Amino acid sequence: MWRDMLEQVSELGNVLPRFTAPRCLLERQAVGGSDACHTTCPHEAVILGQLGSSVDIDPDRCTGCGLCVQVCPSGALEYDLEPALQSVHDQRASGGASLACAPSGAGGPTVPCLGRVTPALVSAAGAWDVPLTLIHGDCPNCPVGAPDVPARVEQLGRAHV
């Protein structure tokens, strides 16, 4: 029990996504490997190694927005979805669920940035038949994510309807 609590606390304090090299298409040198994590990062925190054969996250640049995780086709980059999934699941009885980005100040269940909303989270809400409302703040001036976070999340939602 204590170990689980300590892991949850350490997860909250760590803005860096977990990286699992064996899943990474670049690390595996798979044909058509993906550099989507690198090209989507608004803070230039995802660094590709020589010849694009490795991926590193610069802890000084990473804000934890989650956009790299959202676009990773192999799941090599990830955050723990359990708190967000549990929140959506717990809100089912009210007929809908909401998640807000923390900088919005909207209150209620939050994530650091809506960039952390992944296809798995959208799919889970759909599978539970829970309408999911996402609340963002002033994205163009936010130091965590990027100005186009709402458009990216909307596109993600359309792809999983």
Q: Model regions: which residues?
A:
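Iron-sulfur cluster-binding cysteine motifs and their immediate structural context
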Residues: 32-57, 67-84
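Well-ordered, non-membrane alpha-helical segments in soluble/globular domains
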Residues: 118, 147-156
